[in-house]
Each structure stands twice: as C-alpha cells, then as structure tokens.
C-alpha cells in the first residue's frame, strides 16, 4: 500500500475544510487570511475522503489545490513540514497588519 505525502492549499470556507476529515493530516497551518496549507498523507488504495483523489479535477471540485506531491518517507514529511511552516510564516509576516 504505497503512501503519498501531499501539500494542499485549503480554502478558508468551512465546508471545504471538512474535505480533510478522513485524511491523515500531519500538519495544517492557518495563514493570516484564514486559508491554510495542509500536509496530508494518503494511500493510493484508499482515497481521502471518497471524493478526494489524486486528480486535478477532483481537487478543484473539492476546493483544494494540490501544491506538491511526493512518495512518502520520514525525510520527505520532515522537509515538507519545514517548507509549509516557512511559507506560512513568510506570508503572515508580509500580509499581517
């Protein structure tokens, strides 16, 4: 059962946040404007949730945007966690009042 690490952009609308409820969310960080970046682990055999699969059309329908996808490893997850933390921190420094 191959695992994939995915970085998703999640809209700040509440109904879209719930699209992640059946996923294994490693980390989800909220930006100043309440949108967030989420690091999610999925399996190729189990979609997360049923309408969220690894196709661009499905991510668009669920108002999630796949920013990055990589084969799962501890090193990859650590790297992606640092990367989303850096992005959110820079965004907040730039756009916060």
Swiss-Prot record:
Domain of life, per lineage: Viruses
Pfam families: DUF1623 (PF07785)
Protein name (database record): Uncharacterized 11.2 kDa protein
Organism: Orgyia pseudotsugata multicapsid polyhedrosis virus
